[in-house]
């Protein structure tokens, strides 16, 4: 299989090929559901699937690569090939995607002098190792179904280092890949006029208006190339605490129709959004304003977070039937997977965080100043900082300088205060001595804009006592919250439990595992686990009030649900429903 561009036409094996693509991120979808989502993509009239590749999952530990289980990229590509789908591969190294740190591994931030997305030598050495590992993994698909390979992502929105850009192209050229290379950018003047390496097809990201004028600007910039919208935004992401606003879906369909009438190739971003399982949500920051992405990455896409067909899917399918000669409008649409309501589950066990800090701490290190999460070898979750304080005859104010993102403090295991960025100040009562524990949560690293390097989590400044001096000599330890097996659960305390961050556990029976949706009606803010697998964060401020639980997380018989509540749990129960809250299908404006 050979892809190429001749006379401003995209060819596959010497014949014109119209790219009608949809984006699905394999790492946001349970492996067991890859085929279901890809079959629905093909049944929508599409002939290609696009995916990013997250460096921070495949090389979470420096020098150790993982392409197994849910990260088995080759299995995803194989499934696509079996279904006759072409592939657009987008390996980064930066992916944005509302994903934690834009896909970069956190350990890059612990490297002295390293600078991101430029020709800084140390950064280039790590990029080379990562991309060579990816290319070695997928090489057999270079001649089977990978028709486009992206070498950078929105680089004109970040920098203009052509040495770096040429380095990425050279890595791709030397990998054995001989098909078309692309570079994705937005539509502003400064982005369009930024250079890309020779021989690289510049492709467009857009979706909020008629894309034809932007496509024409790209045509003028590269007259010998066709036009591809690599990200046609058919929905949008959601940030915690913000009101969800559904975009005008009539306009989305209408603008896509104009692009197709204009002759453009398209990739729907997203075709199926999926879920930011675990602590993998990204964030945005402007000054002191921090926006945390939600666990759900539903995106108001043609397929819902749980893979259900929407009215938008059906409208897109009608449209693509006009432009895909190999697709029949009579093709059946695969059925949605069954959902179950398992009802209310009582949380009848409790473990206070302060009493379990030692068993949750990983590789504690002592130092004069507190270590950042990255310096301490952590990446996701929380950080613990411990120090001994002498008693003082007066109350002592404590100020934490330069920290991310939020946290709370204990004195001798007793809850003292909570705080949020950008400032943290609390008071040690008079005549109190002992162990001060400060817990800082990484709520998600930013994934976009020029502040990517300002993503060091935990404490990057210091702790000042009485507004006068730093307190030195700290023990710093990551709390990844991945292994809770050593937590000591006990009986549920008398309710209400206020300002006692801790773990609640309950058990429930399942006869037939099916997809379901977990709700925490009395919860404030925290995260949930099912049978030891981390689902993700929840927040009473919305806009999503449920967590998607794939059937693959459940088992026949007894199941366990654990809730870590950081603030206040009003009721010791959770609920499993057969629909999400909100139900995104009910937002459709096309019915």
Predicted regions and their residues:
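N-terminal carbohydrate-binding accessory modules
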Residues: 1-48, 78
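The substrate-binding groove and active-site-proximal loops of carbohydrate-active enzymes
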Residues: 19-31, 55-72, 109-129, 150-161, ...
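Aromatic-lined substrate-binding rim segments of carbohydrate-active enzymes
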Residues: 35-100, 169-174
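Aromatic- and acidic-residue-enriched segments that line the glycan-binding/catalytic groove
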Residues: 63-69, 93-117, 165-169, 199-202, ...
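An active-site-proximal structural segment forming one wall of the substrate-binding cleft
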Residues: 72-89, 112-146
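Active-site neighborhood of glycoside hydrolase catalytic domains
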Residues: 123-197
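Catalytic-core region of carbohydrate-active enzymes that cleave or remodel glycosidic bonds
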Residues: 174-175, 205-304, 308-311, 319
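Aromatic-lined ligand-binding clefts that engage carbohydrates, nucleic acids, or primary amines
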Residues: 395-410, 436, 508-531, 538-539, ...
């Amino acid at each position: 299989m050979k892809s190429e561009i001749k006379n401003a036409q995209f060819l596959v094996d010497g014949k014109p090929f119209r790219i009608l693509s949809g984006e699905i991120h394999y790492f946001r979808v349970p492996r067991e559901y890859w085929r279901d989502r890809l079959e629905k993509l093909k049944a929508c009239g599409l002939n290609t699937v696009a995916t990013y590749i997250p460096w921070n999952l495949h090389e979470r530990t420096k020098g150790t690569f993982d392409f197994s289980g849910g990260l088995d990229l080759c299995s995803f590509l194989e499934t696509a090939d079996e279904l006759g789908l072409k592939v657009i591969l987008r390996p980064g190294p930066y992916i944005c995607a509302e994903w934690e740190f834009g896909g970069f591994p956190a350990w890059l931030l612990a490297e002295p002098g390293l600078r991101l997305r430029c020709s800084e030598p140390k950064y280039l050495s790590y990029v080379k190792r990562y991309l060579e590992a990816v290319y070695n993994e997928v090489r057999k698909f270079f001649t089977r179904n990978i028709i486009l390979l992206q070498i950078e992502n929105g680089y004109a929105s970040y920098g203009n280092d052509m040495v770096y850009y040429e380095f990425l192209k050279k890595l791709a050229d030397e990998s054995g890949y001989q098909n078309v290379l692309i570079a994705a950018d937005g539509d502003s003047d400064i982005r369009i006029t930024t250079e890309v390496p020779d021989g690289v097809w510049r492709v467009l990201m857009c979706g909020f208006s008629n894309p034809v004028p932007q496509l024409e600007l790209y045509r003028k910039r590269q007259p010998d190339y066709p036009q591809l919208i690599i990200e046609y935004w058919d929905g949008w992401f959601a940030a915690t605490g913000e009101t969800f606003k559904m975009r005008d879906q009539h306009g989305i369909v209408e603008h896509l129709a104009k692009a197709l009438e204009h002759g453009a190739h398209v990739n729907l971003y997203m075709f199926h959004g999926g879920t930011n399982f675990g602590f993998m949500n990204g964030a945005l920051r402007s000054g002191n304003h921090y926006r945390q992405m939600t666990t759900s990455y539903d995106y108001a896409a043609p397929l819902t977070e749980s893979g259900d067909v929407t009215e938008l899917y059906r409208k897109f399918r009608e449209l693509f039937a006009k432009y895909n000669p190999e697709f029949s409008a009579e093709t059946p649409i695969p059925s949605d997977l069954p959902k179950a309501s398992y009802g209310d589950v009582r949380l009848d066990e409790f473990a206070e965080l302060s009493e379990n800090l030692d068993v949750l701490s990983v590789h504690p290190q002592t130092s004069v100043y507190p270590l950042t999460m990255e310096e301490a070898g952590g990446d996701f979750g929380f950080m613990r900082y411990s120090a001994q304080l002498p008693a003082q005859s007066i109350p002592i104010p404590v100020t934490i300088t330069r920290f991310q993102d939020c946290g709370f403090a204990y004195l001798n295991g007793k809850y003292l205060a909570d705080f949020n960025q950008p400032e943290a100040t609390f008071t040690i009562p008079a005549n109190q001595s002992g162990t001060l524990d400060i817990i800082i949560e990484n709520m998600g690293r930013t994934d976009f804009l020029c502040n990517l390097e300002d993503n060091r989590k935990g404490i990057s400044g210091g702790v000042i006592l009485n507004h006068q001096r730093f307190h030195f000599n700290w023990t710093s330890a990551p709390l990844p919250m991945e292994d809770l097996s050593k937590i000591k659960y006990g009986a549920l305390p008398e309710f209400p439990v206020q300002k006692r961050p801790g773990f609640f556990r309950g058990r429930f029976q399942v006869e037939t595992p099916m997809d379901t949706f977990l709700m925490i009606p009395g919860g404030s803010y925290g995260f949930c686990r099912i049978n030891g697998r981390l689902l993700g964060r929840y927040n009473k401020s919305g806009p999503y009030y449920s967590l998607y639980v794939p059937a693959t997380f459940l088992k026949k018989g007894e199941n366990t649900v654990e809730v870590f509540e950081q603030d206040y749990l009003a009721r010791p129960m959770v609920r499993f429903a057969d629909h999400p809250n909100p139900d995104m299908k009910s937002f459709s404006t096309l019915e």
